[in-house]
């Protein structure tokens, strides 16, 4: 029976060096979700989309809708790729279901 000491074999004893590598976590790329102006989608529908899918209050949604109307494009929000992709898909599906040609796109920030 052995006690907690060694087994008499001194091989393998020595100084070990443990190195720690710092991994830099890269922040995910961000994407802007944009709504594009068209001549057919009602302004109220755009406001509804902004409230429903981007959690904008009525005032912010109206401000963005007017920016889209006057400048041709407006930013709905900035998200990671997966979230932005989902938002674009949800908006496009909702617009099609309601027979509106509204376009929603994403671009890398």
From Swiss-Prot:
The lineage of its organism: Bacteria, Pseudomonadati, Pseudomonadota, Alphaproteobacteria, Hyphomicrobiales. This is ATP-dependent Clp protease adapter protein ClpS 1. HAMAP family: ClpS. Belongs to the ClpS family. It comes from the Bacteria. GO terms for biological process: protein catabolic process; proteolysis. Pfam families: ClpS. Residues 1-24 are annotated as: Disordered. Residues 1-11 have a biased composition (Gly residues). The gene is clpS1. Involved in the modulation of the specificity of the ClpAP-mediated ATP-dependent protein degradation. Binds to the N-terminal domain of the chaperone ClpA. InterPro entries: ClpS, ClpS_core, Ribosomal_bL12_C/ClpS-like.
């Amino acid at each position: 029976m052995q006690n907690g000491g060694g087994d008499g074999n001194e091989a393998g004893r020595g100084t070990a060096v443990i190195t720690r590598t710092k991994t830099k976590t890269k922040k995910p790329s961000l994407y802007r979700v944009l709504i594009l102006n068209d001549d057919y989608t009602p302004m109220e529908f755009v406001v509804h989309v902004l409230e429903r899918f981007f959690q904008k209050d009525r005032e912010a949604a109206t401000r963005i809708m007017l920016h889209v109307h006057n400048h041709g494009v407006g930013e709905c929000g900035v998200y990671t790729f997966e979230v932005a992709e989902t938002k674009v898909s949800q908006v496009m599906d909702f617009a099609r279901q309601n027979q509106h040609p509204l376009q929603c796109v994403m671009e890398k920030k």
